[in-house]
Amino acid sequence: MVRKSPGSGKEEDFTFISPVVKYLLIFFNMLFWVISMVMVGIGVYARLLKHAEAAMACLAVDPALLLIGVGILMFLITFCGCIGSLRENICLLQTFSICLTLVFLLQLAVGIVGFIFSDKARGKVSEIISNAIEHYRDDLDLQNLIDFGQKEFSCCGGISYKDWSQNMYFNCSSENRSQERCSVPYSCCLHDEGEAVINTLCGQGMQELDYLEAGEFIHTNGCIDRLVNWIHSNLFLLGGVALGLAIPQVTKHLRAKLIYTWRIGIQV
C-alpha cells in the first residue's frame, strides 16, 4: 500500500496489516500466557507439598521443576508477544520474534542430534531412568510418573526388572531390612483386565526369580527398549505432532514480523 507523507513529495511504502492479524497474535499469546501461569502454579504447588529433604534429593528428575521451568519460559516469551503486539512495541516484538526462532531451532536441533547420536541419546535416557528408579520412593510425582510409564508400556525397570535393585528399598542386599527387599513396584505386575482390586504387593520377591519364572507374574522387559520400539512405530505420528507444534510458532513469528515491519514503516 502506497502512502504519501504530508508536506513531502516522497512516496513511502507501507505494508497494510489487517487488525485480524494483530488481534489473533494477541489472542494466542494471551491463551499461552494463561497456560504458562497455570503450569507455574501447579509446579510451585507440587514443590511446596514435598518434604524439603526429599525435594532436594531428586531435583534432576522432578516433574514439578520441569513444569515450573517450561512455564516461566513460556510466560516470558508470550509476555513479549502479547504486550508487544498490543502496544505495537518494536523492541518487544523483535524480542518475541527472536525467542520463537530460537525455540524452533532448538527443537529442530534436539531432534537432529537425537537421531544422529541415537546411541548416546539412549545412554542419557538410561541414566535418567536409573536416577528416577533410585529416587522412586522420595517423590510422589516421580513415583506416579514411573508407575504410569511402566503400566502404559508394559515394562519394568530401565533395561530389565533387575534394575529395581538400584533402589534402596527394593535392593536385594542382605543389609536391606525393608519389606520391599528384592521386590518390584506393583506397576510391573501382569494384571487381569477384569481385576477390580489391584494387589500392590504382587511384585514381592520378584527379583529373586529368573526371567522365565518372573515372566509369569511381571513384565520383565525394560522400558528403554519398549520406548524405542514405540518411537519407531509412531514416527509419522510424532512427526505430525512436531509439525503441529511448529506451525503455531512459525505463524506467530510471521505475524510478529509483519507488525514489526509495519511499525518500522510508520516511523520512517
Swiss-Prot record:
InterPro entries in the cross-refs: Tetraspanin/Peripherin, Tetraspanin_animals, Tetraspanin_EC2_sf
Localization: Cell membrane; Cell junction, Adherens junction; Cytoplasm
BP GO annotations: protein localization to plasma membrane; protein maturation
Taxonomy, superkingdom: Eukaryota
Annotated S-S bridges: 155-223, 156-188, 172-182, 189-202
Extracellular topological segments: 45-63, 117-226
KW Cell membrane (keyword) present: yes
Residue intervals annotated with topology Cytoplasmic: 1-23, 85-95, 248-268
Entry's Gene Ontology cellular component terms: adherens junction; cytoplasm; plasma membrane
Residue ranges of the TM segments: 24-44, 64-84, 96-116, 227-247
Keywords: Cell junction, Cell membrane, Cytoplasm, Disulfide bond, Glycoprotein, Membrane, Transmembrane, Transmembrane helix
Recorded topology in the membrane: Multi-pass membrane protein
Glycosylated residues in this chain: 171, 176
PANTHER family assigned to the protein according to its UniProt record, in alphabetical order: TETRASPANIN, TETRASPANIN-33
Family membership noted in the UniProt record: Belongs to the tetraspanin (TM4SF) family.
Role: Part of TspanC8 subgroup, composed of 6 members that interact with the transmembrane metalloprotease ADAM10. This interaction is required for ADAM10 exit from the endoplasmic reticulum and for enzymatic maturation and trafficking to the cell surface as well as substrate specificity. Different TspanC8/ADAM10 complexes have distinct substrates.
Protein's recorded name: Tetraspanin-33
Organism this protein belongs to: Xenopus laevis
Gene it is expressed from: tspan33
